[in-house]
Amino acid sequence: MALGDLLSRSSPDQLTRFLAQVHGHPKKGLSQNFLIDGNILRKILAVSCVEAGDWVLEIGPGFGALTEVLVNQGAHVVALEKDPMFEETLKQLPIDLEITDACKYPLSQLQEKGWQGKGRVVANLPYHITTPLLTKLFLEVPNQWKTITVMMQDEVARRITAQPGGKEYGSLTIFLQFFADVRYAFKVSSGCFFPKPQVSSAVVHMTVKDTFPLEESLHKKFFSLTRAAFGQRRKLLANALKNLYPKDLVFSALNQLNFSEKTRPETLSLDEYLKLFQLLSLNS
């Protein structure tokens, strides 16, 4: 069957008919803005690199428009949906469905349930929990993923793909780029959703690295440094880190990296933060 034949769940008419049947409505508190544009679904599929036989984690499938496309591609889909309103309609698709809060779901259970090897994440993320969900994916099971392709608020997408020196660059940028090569794929207009969100959206594609820059036992300490650095981004970097390291030690490390004492947090790249961390760790 052709892909176009299976895009019925992206139909606004079918969505509104379903909502009428279950006497339901989009829940603002769950960031329920349903994708109703088949062309955008095709673009997400193309960007995601999903192939037949891949297993894919989808968070917040809702009515299942993206789910349906993934299934038609030949993927084995594990879907985590919080709203029980969608349970019966999602069960009509050949997927492994969990009605659960994705923020609380222990991702280690995926392997326990038999999902071996590296999977992919493809999702239209609930915007109010985008950052905690992305953080969770890498903190709980960083070696579980090949790629992560997610829709999010455009402002967040630009933040996590930002380059050093700009106001959008921050600790979340560094966190995600530590684990993956992160690419801004394309923007999505509000007219592609029902109901229309008040913000623009974008799709971001992450190719997860085979090896990470630091051993796992050092991750927490490194991210404590980057969070502290950007927690007070208007301050000089040495002042922002004063609760973690003596100021003269930070000055010395910056000097070794050819940065001045007046360096601000947004100046350093991921590689430079890694070098700074190693110098501070050696001398503290």
From Swiss-Prot:
It is found in: Cytoplasm. It holds the Pfam family RrnaAD. It catalyses: adenosine(1518)/adenosine(1519) in 16S rRNA + 4 S-adenosyl-L-methionine = N(6)-dimethyladenosine(1518)/N(6)-dimethyladenosine(1519) in 16S rRNA + 4 S-adenosyl-L-homocysteine + 4 H(+). Its main location: cytoplasm. S-adenosyl-L-methionine binds at N33, L35, G60, E81, D101, N124. It comes from the Bacteria. Its EC number is 2.1.1.182. InterPro entries: KsgA/Erm, rRNA_Ade_diMease-like_C, rRNA_Ade_Mease_Trfase_CS, rRNA_Ade_methylase_Trfase_N, rRNA_adenine_dimethylase, SAM-dependent_MTases_sf. One of its GO terms (cellular component) is cytosol. One of its GO terms (molecular function) is RNA binding. Keywords: Cytoplasm, Methyltransferase, RNA-binding, rRNA processing, S-adenosyl-L-methionine, Transferase. SMART domains: rADc. HAMAP family: 16SrRNA_methyltr_A. Belongs to the class I-like SAM-binding methyltransferase superfamily. rRNA adenine N(6)-methyltransferase family. RsmA subfamily. NCBIfam families: ksgA. Specifically dimethylates two adjacent adenosines (A1518 and A1519) in the loop of a conserved hairpin near the 3'-end of 16S rRNA in the 30S particle. May play a critical role in biogenesis of 30S subunits. This is Ribosomal RNA small subunit methyltransferase A. It comes from Chlamydia felis (strain Fe/C-56).
